[in-house]
Each structure stands twice: as structure tokens, then as C-alpha cells.
From Swiss-Prot:
It comes from Plasmopara viticola. This is Secreted RxLR effector protein 35. Belongs to the RxLR effector family. Residues 342-354 have a biased composition (Polar residues). Residues 1-22 form the signal peptide. The RxLR-dEER motif acts to carry the protein into the host cell cytoplasm through binding to cell surface phosphatidylinositol-3-phosphate. Transmembrane segments: none annotated. It is found in: Secreted; Host nucleus. A motif (RxLR-dEER) lies at residues 48-65.
Length: 435
């Protein structure tokens, strides 16, 4: 629309100049006390009117005639066909300056238009009664911002630019997520699988290290990437690329920034919808509640839950078997009582002085079914070596002279100690009571 506007204005000025030059009646002007000068060509057209009956000086008529070829030269420069008039007008340096000033003049109106478009968009995507309500919008990225990148930020090697792809961690499950995501989007805002994968990965970031500003910067980078991909398509057409390169650099930067904001608005709308509907699009992890209501890092929370289950074979135990075994081995090795073994029968006898073992009670692990299962992290042989001496400390004292009179079942051997440990709870806390 801008190009058509400037074409119409330029053609009207040329046509009026031609009519004035070909007629006997001169153009009228209200001087307002301004004296004509020889360099009156630089005066703006805002002071000239095509209506009036006053007679003006001949030098003003000459001014109009001298201004006419100047406009004609600008308009007809490079024009071969009228269909290309819009492109030629944009190539004029003066037209480029005017176009650069237009965004500043219409900034207020543009903000109102953006606000109205945002309200209409939100109203359009508002769910119906049977759909869940929109969640917290505190993390939304503003859509009222106009992004302007410098020429240096637009410099890029188009040949090395990579297209949008689905991340490897989302392959195989991106289609149902994309379909659920598209159900909450406008008809003209349907996301692609690549866009869904990128936004999904953004919501998995740790927000303590990557606040909302990081999300905004990443969306700007994705929008810039989309513009450069479009520009690479234009580069494939040689004639179209030549026309693009003939434009003045300020005008090219303006066009790129306009396309950037179009891509950016799309990314922002998609991001806001996805983060609002995250629990409805991908769903929370089963039997797992994330602290502080944060559902943006469900994959990491699920991984942490799985890791904790692997660390402890019994969830109710505060420490795993490996760490308990190390502590017990260190303490019992230092306080192990001295033993004497009879080579004839293999029985173990201890001093008559009882050994204090109340300090070792908290370190004794409970021998349950899970302890004797194959899932135990500590080898069974090492447990026998560590527990054998301490368990034998609970055996009653037997006189070596009476060992021949005692039945063989009453002699506490290494085999009995291992059996005691393997039964896991049949014996009481003290072996002498069980015997």
C-alpha cells in the first residue's frame, strides 16, 4: 500500500505540472509575504495551491517548469514498464528517506493496531465452556514490542544456514503433541512439527538460569532465522535477487525488520499458547508432582525420581545398603572382640566378659526379604565376612571341656552364623534366647 500511495502522489504532481505547462493559465500561489528567489526550486510543494486567481511572477512559473523534469527524471529512472513502477519508486533515495520516517510518524497508531489485534486474537482463541480455562499468563512474552536489528546483526552466510528440524528427543512422539497444540491455536496459526519441538524444548529449560528474557532472545533468534531462510529462497531466483540487491541498503534493512516482526509475532503467540496449555498438551508425568507448581521441567523431575529409586532398593530406608555397609564395616572392624577357635570342632569361644554392643544397634540393618533378594547392591560374601564376628559375639560361652558332651546341634559354627543371617528374622535380637 505504501508503494501505491507514493506512485499516485508522484503521478498527480507530474500530471498537474504537465497541465500547467501546456495551458495559458499560470498556477496560483499565496505568497504570505515570502519573496520569490532564484533558487525557489528547493521550496516544498506544501505552499503551492492549484486554485486561486492572483497573478504570480514569471519566475514562479519557471520554477514549476524546472521542477517538472526533476520529478520526471526520478520517476522514469529505470522504468521500462508501468507494472514495475512500485519497485522503482522504492529505489529512489528520497522515497527511501520518506519510508524510514513513516514508522516514527505512525508509531502511536501502530501500537493501537497491535493492541486491537492482540485483543482480537486472545478473544478468538479463548476456549469454550467444555475446555479448561487458560492458566497463569505471568510468563507470557509481550506482543506489543517492535524488534529492530542493526545491519551488522543481519550479516549471515545463507549457504551455511540450517533449516528448522525436530529435535532428536522429540522424535516418535511429536505428532500427538503437535495435534494437541494445534487444537488451541487459531486457524491461521497452525504450528508445524518443527515449531512445536523448538517451543517444547524451551519450556524444559531451568528458569532459574534462563529467565523470561532468555525465552524472548531465543524467539528473536528463531524469527531472524526464518527471515534468512526466506531470503535464501529469493536468492535462488537470479532476477529477483538482482532486484533485491539494487534496493538501497536502508530500504533493505527496513524490509528485513518488517519480516522479522511478522515472524516474531507468530513465535510469541505460539509460545504463549503452549506454555499456558502445557499440562493439557503433554500432560503431567504419572504419579509425580513437581514442587511449587512448576510443570515446565517434568522430564528432569521424572529422571530425578527414577534415579532416587535406583539408589535405594527399599524406598522407606533413608540410606542405601552400600552406604550402611561401609559404616558398619568401619565400626565393627575397630571394635571386633578377640576370638579363639578350637581346631577339632571348629567352635568359637569368647571371653567371659560380655562385650558392649549397644552402640552397634543403630547400625544393624534389618534383614528383610529385600535384603536376601538379588537386587541387593552388596555381595553376600562380603556381608558374611563383616557380620560373622559380630554375630558370634551373641553366642553363649561354652566350656571347651564340655564340647564332647554337648550335641553337635548346639555348637555355633560359621555355617550356623551364615544360616542365621540368611533366615533374616527367625532368630531374635539375642542368639542365646533363640537357642
Amino acid at each position: 500500500m505504501r508503494g501505491a500511495y507514493y506512485i499516485i502522489i508522484a503521478l498527480c504532481v507530474v500530471a498537474s505540472s504537465q497541465v500547467a505547462a501546456g495551458s495559458d493559465r499560470q498556477l496560483q500561489i499565496y505568497e504570505h509575504g515570502v519573496m520569490p528567489a532564484d533558487n525557489a526550486v528547493v521550496k516544498t510543494l506544501a505552499k503551492r495551491f492549484l486554485r486561486g486567481s492572483r497573478v504570480v511572477h514569471d519566475d514562479l512559473a519557471n520554477e514549476e517548469r524546472s521542477f517538472h523534469p526533476f520529478l520526471v527524471d526520478m520517476i522514469e529512472e529505470g522504468i521500462k514498464e508501468m507494472s514495475h513502477a512500485a519497485e522503482i519508486v522504492e529505489e529512489m533515495p528520497l522515497a527511501g528517506k520518506v519510508v524510514e520516517e513513516v514508522p516514527h510518524a505512525t508509531e502511536g497508531g501502530q501500537q493501537k493496531m497491535d493492541k486491537g489485534a492482540e485483543e482480537a486474537f486472545e478473544k478468538h482463541v479463548e476456549p469454550s465452556g467444555h475446555t479448561a480455562t487458560i492458566q497463569d499468563t505471568s510468563r507470557d512474552i509481550s506482543t506489543q514490542e517492535v524488534i529492530q536489528l542493526s545491519p551488522h546483526e543481519w550479516e549471515s552466510d545463507l549457504s551455511k544456514l540450517k533449516p528448522f528440524v525436530v529435535l532428536n528427543k522429540h522424535r516418535g512422539r511429536i505428532e500427538p503433541v503437535k495435534d494437541a497444540f494445534a487444537a488451541f491455536c487459531d486457524e491461521g496459526l497452525k504450528p508445524t512439527t518443527e515449531e512445536t519441538s523448538i517451543i517444547w524444548s524451551m519450556l524444559g529449560w531451568n528458569l532459574a538460569r534462563k529467565p523470561k528474557g532468555k525465552h524472548r532472545q531465543h524467539l528473536i533468534a528463531q524469527a531472524r532465522r526464518g527471515v534468512l531462510l526466506d531470503l535464501r529462497i529469493v536468492r535462488m531466483d537470479e532476477s529477483l535477487w538482482n532486484k533485491w540487491m539494487q534496493l538501497p541498503k536502508p530500504l533493505r534493512m527496513l524490509k528485513l525488520n518488517n519480516l522479522l516482526n511478522m515472524h516474531y509475532q507468530r513465535w510469541v503467540h505460539l509460545f504463549n499458547i503452549f506454555q499456558r496449555r502445557l499440562s493439557e498438551i503433554i500432560g503431567p508425568p504419572p504419579k509425580l508432582k513437581v514442587a511449587h507448581g512448576d510443570t515446565t521441567d517434568t522430564s528432569k523431575a521424572l529422571a530425578l525420581h527414577t534415579h532416587s529409586n535406583m539408589q535405594s532398593s527399599t524406598p522407606s530406608e533413608p540410606l542405601n545398603a552400600a552406604s550402611t555397609f561401609k559404616v558398619e564395616r568401619f565400626v565393627w572392624g575397630a571394635n571386633r572382640p578377640k576370638r579363639t577357635t578350637d581346631g577339632n570342632t571348629g567352635t568359637i569361644s569368647l571371653p567371659t566378659k560380655p562385650t558392649k554392643t549397644h552402640r552397634l544397634k543403630p547400625l544393624m540393618p534389618r534383614l528383610t526379604e529385600s535384603t536376601t533378594s538379588s537386587d541387593l547392591l552388596v555381595p553376600t560374601k562380603r556381608m558374611r565376612l563383616s557380620f560373622g564376628g559380630t554375630r558370634s559375639a551373641f553366642a553363649p560361652y561354652k566350656d571347651p571341656k564340655e564340647k564332647l558332651l554337648a550335641p553337635s546341634s548346639t555348637a555355633l559354627t560359621h555355617k550356623d552364623i551364615d544360616l542365621d543371617l540368611s533366615l533374616g528374622g527367625i532368630y531374635g535380637k539375642r542368639t542365646d534366647k533363640a537357642l
